[in-house]
Amino acid sequence: MLRVVLITGISGSGKSVALRLLEDAGFTCIDNLPVRFLAEFIANARDDAMERVAVAIDVRSPGELAELPDVITASRAMGTSLSVIFLDANTDTLVQRYSESRRRHPLTDRLARGGKTPSLAECIALERELMAPLRDQEHVIDTSDLTPGQLRAWIRDLIQADRPPLVLTFESFAYKRGVPSDADLMFDVRCLPNPYYDRTLRPLTGRDEPVATWLGGFDIVTQMIDDIAAFIRRWLPQYTQDTRNYLTVAIGCTGGQHRSVYVVEQLARRFSDHDPLLVRHRTQLPDDPA
């Protein structure tokens, strides 16, 4: 059976956040679909054997909003599982969000008269009036006091969507080339003993057994890895609960060849039970593909 989640509500209340969550949960998402196209879109999705679809509808087509309840009723009568989530927030919160984003309200031009620009409060008041027939359709969420993360969690619980697994990435890097911009957590291991000063180990990498044996012989190296692993294990559930999809842990040393590579490889072994798990080395190692 085709499942459709309809996201609507007051502009600035979080529809984009909700739609991105549904997209991450595997829904095919359409934003700002005019009401006149909704029935046809649902019919095509059913014919194409699509399973999960999410559609965001806002006030940009005000003349069509009154037709939406009938479209919803007809779609359900044809066997579509359709749920409606109406997002709202108090006017003060909406005004603050618009001020922070510096975006124009979609009804600004509609209310403009004689070259006079309407206030944001006037636009919001008209939008509430136009959206009133939809507010009592099904689920209403007041996002006034919700963070984006909380809103995503609420909607996930509401639609009982599976949480996408968090992709855990360990990457090594060289401080002399700069720090990676994609790192969520960063650990500096330049304080550890450096194999570079052993001429026999210098051309090797942290993935080679002689370097691994050399570094593994120092208690301070093992303790550093233990501490980093313990920190990640302690806080990984919280990062997952924060509804993020990726967590990148960067380990840096001077050249990105010995210590950071070894620590990353050891951490990857300790978290081998986490799926998906990625390992990246920013410095091209001798056995890497060109």
Curated annotation (Swiss-Prot):
What keywords appear on the UniProt entry?
Answer: ATP-binding, GTP-binding, Nucleotide-binding
Organism this protein belongs to = Bordetella pertussis (strain Tohama I / ATCC BAA-589 / NCTC 13251)
The answer to whether UniProt assigns keyword tRNA processing to this entry is no
Name the record gives this protein: Nucleotide-binding protein BP0690
According to the lineage, what is the superkingdom? Answer: Bacteria
What GO MF terms are annotated? ATP binding; GTP binding
One Pfam family this sequence matches: PapZ_C
- Name the InterPro entries for this protein: P-loop_NTPase, RapZ-like, RapZ-like_N, RapZ_C
Q: Which family does it belong to?
A: Belongs to the RapZ-like family.
- What role does it play? Displays ATPase and GTPase activities.
Binding site residues for ATP: G9, I10, S11, G12, S13, G14, K15, S16
Which residues are GTP-binding?
Answer: D58, V59, R60, S61
